[in-house]
Amino acid sequence: KSAHMKKLSFIAGLLVLCACSDNKENSKTATAGPFSVDGKKVTVYTTADSSDYRLSETGTLDFREKGQPFENEITVFVDPSKTFQTYFGIGAALTDASAETFYKLPKEKQQELITAYFDAQKGIGYTVARTNINSCDFSSDMYTYVSDSTDKELKSFNIDHDRKFKIPFIKEAMKSAGNKLNLFASPWSPPAYMKTNSDMLHGGKLKPDYAASWALYYTKFIKAYEKEGIPVWGISVQNEPMATQRWESCLYTAEEERDFLKNHLGPTMEKEGLKDKKIIVWDHNRDLIYQRAQTYFNDPEAAKYIWGLGFHWYEDWSGGTPMYDNLKRVHEAYPDK
């Protein structure tokens, strides 16, 4: 089958969709039956510089049988008998910065923007969103939800900071998405008092004696957000655990992340009744993803808590080559993740 293309923009979009696929539950059903394109149409959205196209619907295309195309025809060939990972969704980061910027817009522009991204009928229908636990590099201030270093049981935990911008912003996105938004949350750093460098910035590590308290912190966040009417689909353990940054950051070796997960975070999620929440590990670049996967998944006590791996695409920041093949290696070695 082929979809005959008149616009290059759709090919770029298709590549993004393919690059974003990997999910534990759905991958098992990828070969459940033959894929049929009968009656299906391709909707083309175009964004182009020096034009009025901004996520603009610019046409529809049909799948049809086709032989050899001409050299000047842009064509994507699809083999329905060959399947890979199942496409889970695409989405956006709903951070403090995006929330604060959103509320600086006029009301009509707010609605236009949220509809364009999250409405499945009038927009492009994002179904996945990520937000931050504590402040991150897309926050205008540095904050946590607990400031008392003696409060290891987190009795003073509160999310008042998020009620002004981030929580209402996420609710707007959820409403536009018809409440079909898979939200996951990630920490950039624990509170400073929990870290070896006593600083939310500049790397540092989680102090071992705060591991139990930090694991409980994730569950407090999830429960607080869900009390506000925001379902949390899952979490990642740590954003970029190998990067010492000027902004919020915290370092974990593969072994440290594995042990924190199996000894603290995983058991605490279960104890707090959050076993159904998905846990994502790594959440960094593709260059080390296979080595990290071996450390996590070769330990059954850690692997049982892991839904999958998250990855970024910054490994070419120093002039290196993007390491796409590492994703294939991980999937081949651990197809159930």
Q: Locations of the language-model features?
A:
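N-terminal catalytic cores of secreted or lumenal carbohydrate-active enzymes
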Residues: 55-232, 253, 259, 263
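Solvent-exposed loop/turn segments at secondary-structure junctions
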Residues: 97-100, 134-138, 189-193, 238-244, ...
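Short, Lys/Arg-enriched N-terminal segments with co-localized hydrophobic residues
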Residues: 1-4
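Active-site neighborhood of glycoside hydrolase catalytic domains
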Residues: 212-234, 241-337
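Sec-dependent signal peptide recognition
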Residues: 6-13
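A cross-family glycoside hydrolase active-site/sugar-binding cleft signature
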Residues: 93, 130-132, 184-186, 236-238, ...
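C-terminal motif of bacterial Sec signal peptides marking the signal peptidase cleavage site
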Residues: 17-19
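Bacterial lipoprotein signal-peptidase II cleavage site
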Residues: 21-27
